[in-house]
């Protein structure tokens, strides 16, 4: 972190002495720049092209040095469109890597890859900035203690618990509740952990980014009246931007998250949507730089690029960054190098199911497909592990019996199987939960359910103590006590109807 009172356009450091060069060649978003002998910029230094195009319009393009070519030339990748640039234009070496604003001033605001606000809410305090390229924390700084990151969401905490400082892959198509789940996690970490969140939109649709921003304002995650009380910072590098911007926007978001972890000593939630677009942008840049492609046309540095990003997402003795990354799987091929490289870094996977969403069970997290390395007796304890395994066994048996039920009906099942089906259906409904951020749509208040309460509830269902309760009593409630109250209300209502 650098206290930097001298920034030009937000995010570009001018601490170093300005050294001018000239554009020698332009190949799309890639520029070759010639500098005076002995005045060559370093790799990752930020270069600024300032001038006027042929129509007299002002141009300000920031680039990042990627290669030193020899003959006093460097090759740089532009972070914005290169329209209007011409050979011979002056290029300034800022003498430092790209730096972005960090700290409380980022909350409630939307930034681009350069750390410039793009939400028309005025300038941001840029006195405290941090370079986007940093080393991962040293071994001695790491917190190696395995601890569960409680989300207050029953299905996640019980069956696929998140690791504090871990990385979670979020798999889900359109319309299954990915955005609502993301917003609920942002809301819950702020309330239960006193933490903040950073959302990195990497190569996503501009419309989706706008929708997320509007929904966050509606649900109070972003506080319009008092912007400083907001719980999230947003960093966007959309699909229409050059590959350089899409490749670096993840690092911009991560840099903002690192400040909250290292300086403010907070637990931070970092969302990256979509991590595949980070790889895709890297592949485009690699081809533009003339590197030989590797397997399936990806960049030869795929593992290095992924590792340098993922290794910075970790727990230290100061705080933690827990990352939830949306993973697009090209053509549903899990062996594709991009998702395969991502899987190597994940501690847990949360799979959203269209089938559950169609049943109206939200969050539509698939309890059988979602996994976690944390679900071990020595980490979560025997009671939690046993309960989770029994829940999974019951749901798996129900899944196996569904074909028989569809053909022959429930009456053809044995007494034991009928009991299993009844309990599985109650478990399925009890895995649903009203969300705080969905209150404006559903009208029912959100519920945060602690892990101990979650385990107790599922143990009561599995033990058969609640077999007499109707299935409806388990749907969209918080803890098991609410189920009991709902069952009594349903009984009273049915008696009144009689």
Curated annotation (Swiss-Prot):
Record field: catalytic activity: ATP + H2O + 4 H(+)(in) = ADP + phosphate + 5 H(+)(out)
Pfam family, one: ATP-synt_VA_C
Subcellular location: Plastid, Chloroplast thylakoid membrane
Enzyme class: translocase
Entries under PROSITE patterns matching the protein: ATPASE_ALPHA_BETA (PS00152)
Main location: plastid
Any one GO CC term of the record: proton-transporting ATP synthase complex
Gene Ontology MF term list: ATP binding; ATP hydrolysis activity; proton-transporting ATP synthase activity, rotational mechanism
Residues the entry annotates as binding ATP: 172-179
CDD domains listed in its UniProt record: ATP-synt_F1_beta_C, ATP-synt_F1_beta_N, F1-ATPase_beta_CD
Keywords carried by this UniProt record: ATP synthesis, ATP-binding, CF(1), Chloroplast, Hydrogen ion transport, Ion transport, Membrane, Nucleotide-binding, Plastid, Thylakoid, Translocase, Transport
GO biological process, one term: proton motive force-driven mitochondrial ATP synthesis
EC nos: 7.1.2.2
Oligomeric and partner information: F-type ATPases have 2 components, CF(1) - the catalytic core - and CF(0) - the membrane proton channel. CF(1) has five subunits: alpha(3), beta(3), gamma(1), delta(1), epsilon(1). CF(0) has four main subunits: a(1), b(1), b'(1) and c(9-12).
Record's function text: Produces ATP from ADP in the presence of a proton gradient across the membrane. The catalytic sites are hosted primarily by the beta subunits.
Family per similarity comment: Belongs to the ATPase alpha/beta chains family.
Name the UniProt record assigns to this protein: ATP synthase subunit beta, chloroplastic
Gene this protein is translated from: atpB
